[in-house]
């Protein structure tokens, strides 16, 4: 398991990836060519992957995402050390916080 700030990145075995993912729409890259895993609401900084890969959002209000890195990749953020990931599949999960009456994603 990898962690960068409020983002968890969990390896997933290829055989455990749901079959619908192959045909699911892929998330677009930002203007800088990155796959954005999470955007900071306060700073505008992003947890993002540079290099080849695909990102698929799973159903639900908070994601999670499935990330495929066929050649491996790096997760970067302006305020955290970069993380190098080996090739493979990953589930990307945003940390959540409980506020009486609701659950929300942690503000980064």
Feature map (PLM): residue ranges:
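Short hydrophobic/aromatic patches at helix-to-coil boundaries
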Residues: 105-108
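Short acidic, Pro/Gly- and aromatic-enriched capping/linker segments at domain boundaries
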Residues: 1, 50-78
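Tight coil/turn sites that cap or link beta-strands
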Residues: 70-73, 78-79, 85-97, 101-102
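Short, surface-exposed, low-complexity cationic segments
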Residues: 13-42, 90-103
């Amino acid at each position: 398991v990898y962690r960068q700030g409020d983002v968890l990145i969990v390896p997933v075995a290829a055989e455990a990836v749901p079959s619908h993912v192959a045909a699911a729409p892929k998330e677009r890259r930002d203007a800088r060519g990155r796959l954005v895993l999470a955007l900071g609401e306060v700073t505008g900084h992003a947890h993002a992957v540079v290099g080849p890969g695909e990102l698929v959002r799973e159903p639900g209000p908070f994601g999670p995402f499935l990330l495929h890195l066929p050649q491996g990749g790096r997760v970067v953020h302006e305020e955290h050390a970069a993380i190098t990931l080996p090739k493979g599949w990953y589930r990307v999960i945003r940390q959540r916080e409980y506020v009486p009456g609701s659950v929300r994603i942690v503000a980064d």
